[in-house]
Amino acid sequence: MRQLMLGNKALARGLYEGGCSIVSSYPGTPSTEVTEEAVKFEEIYCEWAPNEKVALETAFGASLAGKRSFCGMKHVGLNVAADPLFTCSYTGVNGGLIICVADDPAMHSSQNEQDSRHYAIAAKVPMLEPADSAEACEFAKAAYEISEEFDTPVIIRMCTRIAHSQSIVDTKERVCPPTKLYEKNIRKYVMTPANAIARHPFVEERTARLAEFSNTSSLNRVEKGSEPIGIITSSTSYQYVKEIFGDRVSILKLGMVNPLPEKLLLDFAKEKELLLVVEELDPVIETYCKSLGISVHGKDVLPMTGEFSQNLLAEKLSKAFPKLAELIGTIPSGRKLDEEIPGRPPVMCAGCPHPGLFYTLSKNKCTVLGDIGCYTLGAA
């Protein structure tokens, strides 16, 4: 059945279709709706954890018991969950384990603009990055297969625009693999120094196998264009590039952003008169390409901060490259509304019991230090 779905809802659908049994998450925009949608499936047990570290530990425990599990959080939540993330990279999994982290370029509801791809690189775990709702659903199922085949947790990186945009999803039936029985394996699952030393070579060997997988996986694809110009991109940026250039340039669309596909990148770079990397936030793909000796343009013409858009890319690329200016032409600026839509900054949720406390603290001119976004709103 074809349905119009938010990216987060589609990801929850992918968890259901992929046989997920347990979801443990900590809420935070733009990740929250994944768990809110997953709880609607009777076959999935869902809970909110007291923090992201506990959420990942709960999901990891379910994985050890042989169940396919999931935990979700926003980008800053991965800071809190970093301890178990790095350790379960060494231990590996039993049942498939997905960690969803939702980045927030332009900081619509966040205190920083950190790029979660660095965590996947540092922890040496695979990361998938969908570019629309259909991929969010399919990548969830693919992540479970990768997790169990390579004995690793898998991170799915969402972002605000993918999480909160809608596109068509072809829904399918749930496929639930047999539960893998738990085996007590101290050397694999208890990371004392001696055991961790023995597991580290496994992590390095696994990374090499994942890199080979990335080279041939259908998660990454090449779309050939009519001009000798190539663009390497992923996630939301792919949609902007496609809308601007259509089929006129060749595009390497990356769905697996760690490990990056070395051979595929080198092959794509051949016979290109101009090669660009279009990615929001940090130059992760660009830096890797340059480490391979590939000459690319990226952050020398595109901003390091904020979100991209069709107009922003068209303006920056046209100014930097006359050849692209010819291909781009004029991008319509869009219609102007008779009345501007008022801004909708974050507010306390309806029914929240805490505004009274914040009012009292403010009235008494108290200075209070907090951590999560709700406390930040109290400052207003």
What name fits each language-model region?
Residues 26, 219-225, 371-373:
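Short coil/turn segments at secondary-structure boundaries
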Residues 22, 29-148, 358-359, 367-380:
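Thiamine diphosphate
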Residues 1-8, 12, 17, 130-348, ...:
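Flexible, low-complexity linker and terminal segments
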Residues 25-28, 199:
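Selective for proline/serine-rich intrinsically disordered segments
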Residues 27, 73, 253-255:
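Residue-level recognition of beta-strand->loop/alpha-helix junctions
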